[in-house]
């Protein structure tokens, strides 16, 4: 039987997909054309670019307008839950009505000092918008798995619900299984390229391929040993190609088959936003 990669037209080359990053970040903006070019040379063909604050929204939308490979997501990160400006929800609604955007990056983070009650209120408000406008949702979760999983199970488990992705997953195998049962996508970051990430590698092995996405979270999540060598100051989307090869090895599958599967996953995940383009 032919593999899924072999079934594709020989003239069609499937690209790597970076399922979560921040191209609007100042660390990348200074040399963004070179960053995109290097990614393209490695075969990376799509970028899910996420805002973290209201200041990012128009920047992310502008990037998507000038770089066809960029899929925009706009939202407010939990780190900024205590500094949101009045009227943010109405302004986000207006952009969602006008633009082909997903919602994110939002979520919960007990590691940061921002009041958790405010985080929950902000997260739930953005969940409501993703549901209202039927847009894909990108979730950041650190040490907050109980409330995050409860909300996803309550709001996103139905067939009519928009898709949701847990970015840079750091939870347990058991939590992953609950999320997958609820229909969520699990995105693994370039942290997996680090030597000491045994826990996350175990989760990756147990996660069904049809629910996996891969990301760099550029310019963050540079593997610690790379940073220690001083060879690189920040992460870049081109390194997602290395992550694909690592994941293919861990899952014991052909990397070309993995590219096909994850490209399909990305298309399904972003369909709600892309359908408005």
Regions found by a protein language model. Name each.
Residues 1-277:
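Mid-domain alpha/beta scaffold segments of enzyme catalytic cores
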């Amino acid at each position: 039987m032919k593999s899924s990669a072999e079934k594709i037209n020989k003239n069609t080359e499937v690209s790597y997909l970076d399922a979560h990053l921040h191209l609007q970040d100042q660390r990348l903006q200074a040399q963004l054309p070179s960053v995109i070019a290097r990614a393209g040379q490695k075969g990376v063909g799509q970028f899910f670019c996420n805002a973290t604050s209201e200041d990012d929204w128009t920047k992310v939308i502008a990037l998507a307008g000038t770089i066809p490979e960029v899929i925009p997501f706009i939202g407010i990160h939990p780190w900024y839950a205590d500094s949101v400006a009045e009227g943010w929800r109405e302004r986000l609604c207006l952009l969602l009505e006008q633009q082909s955007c997903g919602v994110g990056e939002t979520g919960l983070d007990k590691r940061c000092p921002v009041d958790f009650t405010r985080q929950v209120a902000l997260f739930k408000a953005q969940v409501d918008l993703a549901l209202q406008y039927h847009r894909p949702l990108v979730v950041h979760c650190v040490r907050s798995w109980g409330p995050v999983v409860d909300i996803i199970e309550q709001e996103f488990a139905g067939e009519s619900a928009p898709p949701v992705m847990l970015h840079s997953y750091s939870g347990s195998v058991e939590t992953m299984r609950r999320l997958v049962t609820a229909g969520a996508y699990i995105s693994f970051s370039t942290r997996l390229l680090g030597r000491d990430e045994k826990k996350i590698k175990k989760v990756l092995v147990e996660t069904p391929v049809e629910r996996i996405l891969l990301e760099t979270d550029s310019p963050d999540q540079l593997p610690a040993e790379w940073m220690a060598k001083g060879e690189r100051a920040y992460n870049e989307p081109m390194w997602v190609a290395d992550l694909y090869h690592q994941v293919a090895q861990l899952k014991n599958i052909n990397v070309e088959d993995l590219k096909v599967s994850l490209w399909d996953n990305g298309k399904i995940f972003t369909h709600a936003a892309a359908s408005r383009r």
